[in-house]
Structures are given as C-alpha cells and as structure tokens.
C-alpha cells in the first residue's frame, strides 16, 4: 500500500517539497506519494482533516498555517514547543497528531555540512520572526558559545531572549542576548539572516564593521543567483556565504526521517535541486 504525504500552504504552487521528497524516496524503495495542497486561508483544519481521513500519514505545513497546525497537535516536540509553530505533522497509530518543527534542525544540519562543528561559535541572528524563533533551540543545542539576536524592532528580539532564557531553569540564560542593530559591536563567527529582506533585494540595517575576513554569513533565503544579503556580505569581506537552499533540503530530510525512519542523502538532492533552480526561467 502506498502511503500519502503532502505539504499544505497558501500559496503553494512554488513549493519544492514534492520534488525533494520524491528524490528522497526514489533510492529507498519506499512506497509513498507526496503532493502540494492549496488550503483555503480559512480552511486549513478542514483540508488537513480530509487528508488524514483519506489515508494521509503525514504532512508538512508552510505559510500561513504553521501556528494553526501547532494548535491542532495532541503532542509536540521540544523544538516545536519553543518555536510556537510546527512544520511537520505525523498521524500516529492511535489516531493522534504529533507536531515537530524541523526548520532549525535543517539549518543546523546545513551549517555543519558546510562548516563542521558549531561548538564555541559566536552567532548573530538577524530577525525575530517565526523563522528566527524556530532556529534558536537547535543552535543552542549545537553548543555554540553565544547567540546574539538583533531585529529592527528591538522589543521583538528581547521577547525571544526572555522566552529562551526561561527554558530549563535558565540553562541558556548566559548564552542568549538581544542587541539593537545600531549598537552591534565585536566579532561574530557566523551571521544568520532570518529576514525575508533579500526577496525584495533589500538589506537589514547592519553596521558593516561586524563582518570580518573570518565571518561566515548565511541567508535563509535562496534563489538562482546570489541573494542581496550574501552579495553585501561578500562586498564587506566575509570569508564565506551560504544561502538557505540547504536548509530547505535539511528540514525536509528531518521530516522524512520522522515519517519513514530513514535518513536520506541530502547532498545528492541538494545538487539536483540547485541545478533545477538554475534551469528555471528567470
């Protein structure tokens, strides 16, 4: 019997997930299908329920339904709990729904694939929205030395700090801080842009001096050409820039493993996806 999986979103026609999961499944002999489902903005729960009632086994969730998906779960992972959102749903044998958030796990996996261990790295996270929030616990669990969060609206960055410094009786309190963009100083080993500014060809208002010849810059956005943030980082002398395509493949791989118990080959699929992206009409 073929197991059904899907990604829910609105819009969803642009989704790379069906291609990615199809490539994951191909060499494993796993019998499954994976489709993109456009859910009405006010009809996500009904669409998801219909999918599960028709035999669906699991689903990915993207904008704008991640918070709604969180509310529908009977159980959630630690990453999902702290993110306040889920991107992966699993229908369990007892009929309950488990929610996971694999976004941050995908980011960390891609960083490690490119850089090796993240232990003792000083990380600057730009942005304080859902993308940033979902990545904080996985970054901290990767044993980084320090996480600085900076956002145009400083109160949002401080709110994230308050959430994560209260976790595990303050276990992370000394590792997470919020700093105004205009007051950023010192050196960072890794700078991560979690904002969508690059999609509009724009940049966060960052001081150039935070980038050194040792700094690696990571933009969660991606495209056929270099992103605006990464182009700026190179112009300021960054040692290396990475876009978010590997994070996309990485989070999908974590979902696939949760559902199938198999770890797919992400590098092969990333190469195929990069080639596919480059071949798309500009």
UniProtKB/Swiss-Prot annotation:
EC number of this enzyme: 1.1.1.25
Enzyme class per UniProt: oxidoreductase
Pathway note: Metabolic intermediate biosynthesis; chorismate biosynthesis; chorismate from D-erythrose 4-phosphate and phosphoenolpyruvate: step 4/7
CDD domains: NAD_bind_Shikimate_DH
Listed GO CC annotations: cytosol
Catalytic activity: shikimate + NADP(+) = 3-dehydroshikimate + NADPH + H(+)
Active site: 66 (proton acceptor)
Superkingdom of the organism of origin: Bacteria
Record-level GO BP terms: amino acid biosynthetic process; aromatic amino acid family biosynthetic process; chorismate biosynthetic process; shikimate metabolic process
Residue sites binding NADP(+) per the record: 127-131, 151-156, 220, 244
Entry binding sites for shikimate: 15-17, 62, 87, 103, 222
Molecular function GO labels: NADP binding; shikimate 3-dehydrogenase (NADP+) activity
Keywords: Amino-acid biosynthesis, Aromatic amino acid biosynthesis, NADP, Oxidoreductase
Protein family (similarity comment): Belongs to the shikimate dehydrogenase family.
Role summary: Involved in the biosynthesis of the chorismate, which leads to the biosynthesis of aromatic amino acids. Catalyzes the reversible NADPH linked reduction of 3-dehydroshikimate (DHSA) to yield shikimate (SA).
Subunit: Homodimer.
Entry protein name: Shikimate dehydrogenase (NADP(+))
